[in-house]
Structures are given as structure tokens and as C-alpha cells.
């Protein structure tokens, strides 16, 4: 984060300011949440883009939307643009691919090359890094790449504490026991369990 918030200091030492990073890993592990918290800590404006936000994905016009997105981010800089499920937005350019998709990827590459000079940082998240166009992962683009694993036992315990924090509970909750019983569960699974339990309790109380 320091390299983004103290750009001039790092440039003085000849450090190349990164333009973006890729967060990849299994579904439900909090990649978008991490992106938002990263932005919050840096004090940047946060812009979340999902595949459905680019309605021109299979018709002409998608590249113009990408260009306008980066212009808007620059006008409100410092900004973080988070492309959620980036594999669906910027897939590999292969023979026979829709020309509008190829044009959109080309526009993205042109825009991200200039991000650090415009007060913009790009974060891309995906469950399928192998489907992303290779050019996006080269130096000067999404060069920072981090694997976000499923939560371990201690992380699951902390997630239960987080989601149960403001819930009404008639008994003391054994967070460690819950963690032990939810091996291989991801963050979204734990959130669902807590919400389901709260809903069931509320329904019983109504009756």
C-alpha cells in the first residue's frame, strides 16, 4: 500500500510503481472483500466492476465502456478499479474469438499501461486464472499476483466470531468447535451458515 500512497518517495529511489494485481483462488474466499479493504486502507475511491456491468460484452461498444471507466477513475483519483471475475471480462484472445471481445481486451491493455501515472490501480479477481489473456499478466500490468486460499482453522474461527458478533445468542458459542466442524468451508459458506441459523431462530421465536 505504501508504494501507492507515497508514489514520489518510491520514484525517488527508482522504484517502478505497479499498475495492478491479480487475486486468484477458489470461489467464496473473499477476494472482492480483500480488494475493498485494500482500497479502504489506502484511502482510494473504490470502483467495483462485474461482468454484468459491461452489457456490451458480446457486441460492439465494450471497448468504449472500458475507456470511459478509466477516464472516470482518473477524474476521481486516486482510485482502485476492481474487475470481479475478470476471466469473464478479459478472456484469452484465441482464433475465432468475437472481435468485440478482442477489442475490449486490447483497450484494457492500453489503459492499464498508463494507470500509475493517472492515480489508478487495478485489482482483478478470478477463480480461473488460466482463462485470462496472457498479455494481462505481463510486467507493467497485473504483475502482482496473489493466491487467496480457503480459510484455515484459525481463520474460520475468526470468521465465525465476525459474523456472530452482533447476533442475539441465548447460549455461549464455542467458536473453536464450529471451526473444527467446518473443514474446507470458505468464507461465504460460514456467512451462509450463520445467516441460516439466525433465520431459523427468528422463525421459531415468531411462532
Task: For each feature predicted by the language model, list its residue ranges.
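AAA+ ATPase "lid" subdomain C-terminal helix
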Residues: 180-207
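Walker A/P-loop NTP-binding motif of AAA+ ATPase domains
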Residues: 1-181, 185, 197
Amino acid at each position: 500500500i505504501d508504494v501507492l500512497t507515497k508514489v514520489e518517495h518510491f520514484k525517488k529511489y527508482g522504484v517502478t510503481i505497479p499498475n495492478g494485481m491479480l487475486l486468484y483462488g477458489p470461489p467464496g474466499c473473499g477476494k472482492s472483500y480483500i480488494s475493498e479493504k485494500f482500497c479502504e486502507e489506502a484511502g482510494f475511491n473504490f470502483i467495483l466492476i462485474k461482468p454484468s456491468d459491461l452489457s456490451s460484452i458480446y457486441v460492439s461498444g465494450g471497448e468504449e465502456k472500458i475507456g470511459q471507466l478509466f477516464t472516470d477513475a482518473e477524474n476521481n483519483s486516486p482510485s482502485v478499479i476492481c474487475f470481479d471475475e475478470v476471466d469473464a471480462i478479459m478472456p484469452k484472445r484465441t482464433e475465432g474469438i468475437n472481435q468485440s471481445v478482442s477489442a475490449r481486451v486490447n483497450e484494457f491493455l492500453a489503459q492499464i499501461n498508463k494507470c500509475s501515472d493517472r492515480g489508478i490501480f487495478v485489482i482483478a479477481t478470478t477463480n480461473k486464472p488460466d482463462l485470462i489473456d496472457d498479455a494481462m499478466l505481463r510486467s507493467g500490468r497485473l504483475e502482482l499476483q496473489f493466491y487467496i486460499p480457503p480459510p484455515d482453522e484459525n481463520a474460520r474461527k475468526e470468521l465465525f466470531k465476525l459474523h456472530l458478533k452482533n447476533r442475539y445468542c441465548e447460549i455461549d458459542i464455542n467458536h473453536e468447535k464450529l471451526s473444527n466442524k467446518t473443514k474446507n468451508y470458505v468464507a461465504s459458506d460460514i456467512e451462509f451458515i450463520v445467516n441460516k441459523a439466525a433465520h431459523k431462530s427468528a422463525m421459531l421465536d415468531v411462532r
